[in-house]
């Protein structure tokens, strides 16, 4: 499962860079883990070059064409060994079970499904395998005659699965009579902090979008012993903030320079991120933390993004090979829709009142101010599996 976590985290960074190309000055928030699981469900029925391209984009296997730090190439070759399709999907089965295990300390609601035009029926074996490995049931629907009704039904299903938090995933023109197959993928997350933000400490403060522009935000504040890490090139400060029970952590990467976000995004690699956030790089500080209260709800139509990353055959009527999924010819992936929702606020710590003293340090630790009052990167990690569940940037309140 370690190799799969590495693959998903690498995919998260590659996807974030690709999304950033067309989202200058905009917030980004997505779940690479969930997108990867959705695409792996389709990869299960892919054959030939279609399967090979998907495996490459999802980082299931590496080649010389993928940029990497030279000093870590040898290590990579031992880590990325998911060349066996069965191994990939067994690993996903274990991972999904671990991440979605019932938990009272955070809410993680997912909606993950494939919908295919009913004239392209699925193989029974494929349906069985998808249910076994991914806990999902691909649906055969009537896009040809009732695409708008199907769209509404999909939206209703997603809304139910996410307890009403994610609505209208598919817009009016997102599917039509020529749609063959779509992937829908939506997540809602709300966590409970290990250490509390007090509501009375939240005040309106300026968030500096750049050197000349700022917007008011509700800035939360806490003073607590937290784990800090330093990034030298480019200069940035990192912080780990645990959710209750420490199953999950929020990591924030804050450039020293107000305009330093783009430089940090370009510099980041999987190897660097792993090094920066490793336990031996963390130091405990007495932190004065200023963190904006925010809510992000981002939607993505990923067809062009994934195609440009290298899996174009899956979206091509003439090139796609999904013969492991259906015996009907010309089945291809029409689109991949993704929506993720997160809230970062004080409310998450209501149930954690009094937990601030659970960890005590008798030795004096250095103090530091961590003021997230300008654009930063952040991600939420599932600590047991080392998986990045969500990845984002906050630059526009």
Curated annotation (Swiss-Prot):
Keywords: Cytoplasm, Nucleus, Protease inhibitor, Serine protease inhibitor. A motif (Nuclear localization signal) lies at residues 74-77. Belongs to the serpin family. Ov-serpin subfamily. One of its GO terms (molecular function) is serine-type endopeptidase inhibitor activity. It is found in: Nucleus; Cytoplasm. It comes from Plecturocebus moloch (Dusky titi monkey). SUPFAM superfamilies: Serpins. Pfam families: Serpin. It comes from the Eukaryota. The keyword Transmembrane helix does not apply. Protease inhibitor that may play a role in the regulation of protease activities during hematopoiesis and apoptosis induced by TNF. May regulate protease activities in the cytoplasm and in the nucleus. Its main location: nucleus. The record marks 362-363 as: Reactive bond. One of its GO terms (cellular component) is extracellular space. SMART domains: SERPIN. This is Serpin B10. InterPro entries: Serpin_CS, Serpin_dom, Serpin_fam, Serpin_sf, Serpin_sf_1, Serpin_sf_2. The keyword Electron transport does not apply. PROSITE patterns: SERPIN. Coiled coil: none annotated.
